[in-house]
Design a protein with these regions (language model features):
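Catalytic cores of histone-lysine modification enzymes
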Residues: 1-91
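C-terminal SET catalytic tail plus cysteine-rich post-SET Zn-binding segment of SAM-dependent SET-domain
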Residues: 83-179
Length: 179
């Protein structure tokens, strides 16, 4: 799981992104999402990381109700962008979040996973626009929010870890723990 296989560079999708430095095989583990482990209460206190971008955080919600804050003691995994047609998946295993390849990834290709953000609110056009997706995939949903049917099935333990965003921070601690 060497981070030398990936590197952070400028992304055409959003700011910084993570790119394959060498070819990566389907199933390979690329990196662990690291950062300080904090409570939702602390995440709420720290929010927003950048007032100019209130919907952008480096939070990753864990099944335990804790949050990984990738801004503090984080690594390059925090720069992996969202795509509606991802080549990777983030998975929680024993309280750790690992990113692994869903398919072969070519050298120079940007690494993506589907954030699948779960919001405890009705998905209005305005809300979808707040979490607009710019991945450019052929079947782009237009938003980083999980499809409503995916939200209902989001309770799979140990699978499909979700990157926590400002919407989670805007909700109450109890609601945010539903991730």
């Amino acid at each position: 799981m060497s981070s030398r296989r990936i590197a952070v560079r400028r992304s055409g999708v959003h700011g910084k992104g993570v790119f394959a430095v060498e070819a990566i095989a389907a199933g390979d583990r690329l990196i662990e999402y690291k950062g300080e482990r904090i409570s939702w209460k602390e995440a709420l206190r720290r929010h927003p990381h950048n007032p100019a971008e209130p919907n952008h955080t480096f939070y990753f919600a864990l099944d335990s109700g804790k949050v990984i804050d990738g801004k503090v003691d984080g690594n390059s995994a925090r720069w992996i962008n969202h795509s509606c047609a991802p080549n990777c998946e983030a998975e929680e295993i024993d309280g750790h979040v690992y990113v692994h390849a869903l398919r072969d990834i070519a050298q120079g290709e940007e690494v993506f996973y589907d954030y699948g953000l779960v919001i405890d609110a009705r998905q209005t056009k305005k809300l979808k626009k707040e979490y607009e997706c710019r991945c450019g995939a052929r079947k782009c949903r237009g938003t980083m929010l999980a499809p409503p049917e995916k939200e209902k099935g989001a309770g799979k333990a140990g699978k499909s870890a979700k990157k926590a965003k400002a919407s989670d921070v805007k909700t109450s601690e109890k609601k945010a723990k539903k991730k």
